Curated annotation (Swiss-Prot):
Organism: Serratia phage KSP20
Stated name of the protein: Major capsid protein
Keyword annotations of the record: Capsid protein, Virion
Origin: domain of life: Viruses
Propeptide section residues: 1-31
Keyword Cytoplasm belongs to the record: no
GO cellular component, one term: viral capsid
InterPro entries documented for this protein: Phage_P2_GpN
């Protein structure tokens, strides 16, 4: 670490101590991040990613409790102007699971001395450190949200490179708590580069599968929700649309313009806005509003240690947060779990 980096880093440590109302020495030990600072860190993490900025990130007081947003059993409006028959308010909360449980997840982060030396010549040295940690925390949460299937202690990153054992994510919650909202193992008609059918599948195309899933799995009052979107992997969208794009390129003079319109982010699948999410399973499709997905973190539950590790030529930040990944209303969910393109029998 260069001398100028040393001076800036010491200032960073002093600032962290000041913000969290602890001594500089305590920063290198274990300390609880001040709830106000934690909220700012969460906001920075959410703003650092376009997907997280669209869903909810809620701070909750209790580690275990009821969801912040309770699903609806349906419409409540009615008419009763009688003077003899009383109006009867009904409980409109869903019967599907509505509890959450925040569990400890480690988001440890190391920054090399070399990287710090490079940042030392930037005017925003301290924000660069904070932003790097916030960004990685965001990516890890998205990865767990879409791939997490268990909570193992200890977790094994080598065996679970997508953090499958660091928590139960959105998709696994749907599988376990609302299996009636899931269609599994379907096929889509496969086509060649000229858009000619190779093998017929359960559905003619991805849009047809999405349309059927929405209309057969969602509660009636959610099917036409204007906030519904399609969330999938870029691989599936590209594979699905390539034959159509290629066919247009051979028959339409406005090739580049039309092809560009097909692959822009605003492209609609199943007549709904489509969002390509990082780390989303390549064989899955989720239909739901963004605001039906939430990450809960426990206020006051963020623990942190920032210390130098010269034996590894780095500064290490050891931090843990109590988190949960929540689907607020299962009635506004349709999940296709296992979608592939039909293959010819006997591989021929």
């Amino acid at each position: 670490m260069e001398n100028i980096t040393r001076e800036l880093f010491d200032q960073y440590i002093s600032r962290q101590a000041q913000l969290n109302r602890v001594s500089p020495a305590a920063v290198a030990a274990k300390f609880a991040v001040d709830p106000t600072v934690q909220q700012k860190l969460e906001a920075a993490a959410q703003e650092s990613d376009s997907f997280l900025s669209k869903i909810n990130v809620f701070g909750v007081t209790q580690q275990i409790g009821q969801k912040v947003l309770i699903g609806s059993k349906g419409p409540l409006a009615g008419v009763n102007n009688s003077t003899t028959t009383r109006r009867n308010p009904a409980d409109n909360s869903k019967m599907e699971p509505y509890d959450y449980m925040c569990r400890k997840v480690n988001y440890d982060y190391g920054i090399s001395y070399e990287q710090l030396d490079a940042w030392a010549h930037q005017p925003n040295f301290q924000p660069l450190i904070s932003s790097a940690m916030a960004r990685q925390m965001s990516l890890d949460r998205i990865m767990i949200g879409f791939n997490g299937t268990s909570y193992a202690d200890p977790s094994n990153r080598a065996a679970n490179p997508l953090l499958q054992d660091c928590g139960i994510g959105f998709l696994e919650k749907i599988r376990k708590e609302a299996p009636h909202r899931v269609i599994s193992n379907i096929t889509v008609t496969s086509r060649d580069e000229d858009n000619k059918i190779i093998t017929k599948g359960t559905y003619g195309n991805v849009s047809a599968a999405v349309y059927d899933a929405k209309n057969s799995l969602m509660d009636e009052w959610h099917k036409r929700n204007p906030d519904n979107v399609v969330i999938l992997a870029g691989d599936l969208l590209t594979t699905s649309n390539f034959p159509a794009i290629n066919a247009m390129s051979q028959t339409n003079p406005n090739t580049e313009m039309l092809a560009g319109q097909l692959i822009v982010a605003q492209e609609r699948v199943g007549n709904m806005p489509t969002f390509i999410a990082p780390f989303f399973p390549v064989n899955g499709i989720l239909i739901t509003p963004f605001k039906n997905l939430s990450i809960y973190y426990q206020r006051g539950g963020l623990r942190r240690t920032i210390k130098e590790e010269p034996e590894y030529n780095r500064v290490a930040t050891y931090q843990s947060s109590n988190d949960d990944f929540v689907v607020e209303d299962y009635g506004n969910v349709a999940f296709i779990d296992g979608i592939t393109f039909a293959q010819p029998e006997n591989g021929g």
